[in-house]
Amino acid sequence: FDNFDWHDSILNSVIINRQNLGLNDVVELDITWPSGERGILLFKNVRKCVINLNSGIDTKDWVYNAYETEDDEDFVSYKKQVVNICNDIDKLKCFVIETSTTGSFVKIFAIQVVERSSIDL
């Protein structure tokens, strides 16, 4: 996740797929990378998603920073809340995407993130 070329990529869309409710909730990010290529990131086995998106602004949502962290306050608090009911908590990761255009952010607490190539789109 940290190895993607995030700075100046564009966050095109965020899709929350709950068709397999509670078993494998998925968050899908549609990204245009600085190279112009489009990519889809699938966050699988999502346990929580915190989205603070500012809408109504007529411009693309440029990514300022994106990173994986163990120290996010919301993530630490969430893990404390579910430690006794979540049997795979040690596999849980926190992914944060921050935008520069609107000051928005997305935090995804998930077990796994995979890239779906543009060939699959």
Descriptions of predicted regions:
Residues F1-L121:
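Surface-exposed, interaction-prone regions used to assemble/regulate multi-protein complexes
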